[in-house]
Amino acid sequence: MENTQNKLNFLSWEEAKNKAKTFLKDFTIKEKIRLMYGSAMNPGNRCVGQIEPIKSGIFKPEKFAGIKFCDGPTGPRFQKGLTNSWPTPINLASTFNRKLIYEVGKSQGNEFYHVGVNVALTPCINMFRVPTGGRNFENFGENPFLTGELASELIKGIQSNGVIACAKHFIGNEQEKYRCASNSIIDERTLMELYAEPFYKAIKKGDVGCIMCSYNAVNGVYLFKNKLMNDVLKDKFKFNGFIISDWFAVYDDSPDSINNGLDINMPGTKSKIPIVGDLWFNPSLWSKVPKYVEDGLIAEEKINDTAERIISTMYKFSQIDYFPKKEFYSQSYITENTKKLNRKAAAESNILLKNEDNILPIDLKKIEQENKKYKIAILGIDAVKGEFYGQEPNFINFIIPIKSVDGHIANGYGSGTTTFKYIVDPYEGILNKVQNYKNIELIQYAKLDKEDNEDIETSVEKSKDCDLVLIFVQSISGEGYMKIGNSFGDRKDLSLLHNGEKLIEKVSDVNKNIVVIINAPGPVNMDWRNKVKGIIFGGLAGQESGNGIADILFGEVNPSGHLPFVIGKREQYPADIKDIQEYDILSTNLSSSEALEFKDVVNYDEGLFIGQYWFDKKNEIPIYHFGYGLSYTKFVFSDLKCNFNKELKQLEAKFKIKNIGNYEGGVVAFLYLTFPLEDEKYPIRVLKGFDKYFLNINEIKECSIIVEEHDLSYYDVDSKNYIMPNKGYYTVYIGQSSDIKDLTLTEKINIE
């Protein structure tokens, strides 16, 4: 594969803006307006939207080559299996590994680049506000600091290949239910410090080139015309790139959208998808813009600013001078190197939640030395391939009616998915490990009955005399335009599909040596957890999912994943999506006055207290804390020393980690702060630093985490700015999860 970066010439924003002014010098006002809306949504062309080229005239060269947009968070969409299907962002977040996520972004960017995509519609940086949220798997978890840090690495990786990343969905889009006709009520402090924070980091650390606004309204105004685009992104955060609408999210033809910060309306023209047809399209806006400019309702300077933003962003990422033509069918971009990286990310994202009696890892050499038969039962439909992965029509991707899931889940569904060229299921991954060991006998069984439930009776019989039972269970969610299993986008509940809870409980009656592997987009019911010895949360880990799980089970990879969300019972969470029901999402997004009528009001009354912060505030004990994750080895933290640099306004925490166990492995160090604030509306401890360290047996590492001024600040509503407290003590906590029992190092430091 051609090395993308050899031909790229990246510019500073200032250089790019100067070039854009020169480039646009001969453009008419109508040609500049033509940059501001798309021309089609046609998956048959392998991109989800585009801005058409602008020609100088008949038989004359193009003045502008156009822009092609493509989803998404797990790799290029609609590529007929030519590109990789990567672990979902929630899995990437579980690694807490900035370097790894940068490499995944870099590899994804290379794929987007070589198929001719200018703008990759990724990453999603909404918050894991409710445990049942349909698109939780497309995001990086419940914490704004974590999300901003990791999303910035993915952005930098993608954009290192000259592909513009698009951070989405700005803002307050944490559920699928009536997402196109809902009104999120969010107070200013919560909006700025929690939900806007990942966008701040995407801009300041990731230097993201594009941001997408969401379908919903915030505080009574739909985002496509909400002044938050100007006030927050462009003015306060100094965003230099361009803002696009979500697809079909411009509901009226007033000048408000352009005046309040929207730069591009997507997809801009009638959809070519039959099920969508004439819905969601209001073409009259763009025919009216020239008249709006003529009448002074839209300033010509606004049109110029938008055009310059679009062209300067393309210059910055070397897309004007050199960019390949669309080559969607040219070749496969699945290589041995991408498979290796994919597998590494999948394995590192697995989270070991329980390991009673050291039931894991499975020691194949020891079993062979004992020279007796060792029987492993592999139960559950999630252990084997189903009908969904591969070429059309059998893939979870777009608007395809599917009753349920009948095999291993490695992705959610909707626009954040890909077409799988292949998938390694867990049974295949396990078989590859044991096939050369004559004493290992695998007993695999999975069958769904007419009610779509596991055949529990047979599963129990097959597991009775086994030395080890591996039970694979699942749940799924996705974008809210179709129903699968227990979800219509958002999950109706936290139950496992196919009566998975009953399968675990019945098998546990006849065999105690059970390891449960969960493939799901987020928390599930775990009332059965005390009946098994081992639990792994595998998330939705992409095409190498089965190999990644097998690497953990057999100890080839020491688990180092940590939860990017808290796991509790549904009633313990501060927010929920009530009355999830089957509704036609298309009918809530018509280009008419009906679309402007709110069908749901979502009150963010919990303020800053989502996820673990809520559990801390209420002294609730979760099932598993944010950041929890076990290893096959043990680590000890010691010797914390903190220093505050008044000149740089930085806090540095130095400490040591020692691996005192019998395996080499990785561990995440979390830095939490208690702010010098007497404010009951502020969390008790906030995550403001983390890093991942890999240590050999008996190795000691000297570690350092630096907290910058912005992360030492809070949002002050009166001054409408981020400010540091001017006196008092921060309390610094260092440890292996958010649980106060794991935060073993602590020190107070004076900032005066």
Give residue spans per PLM region.
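Glycoside hydrolase catalytic-domain context in secreted enzymes
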Residues: 1-740, 752
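Intrinsically disordered, low-complexity regulatory regions in eukaryotic proteins
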Residues: 744-752
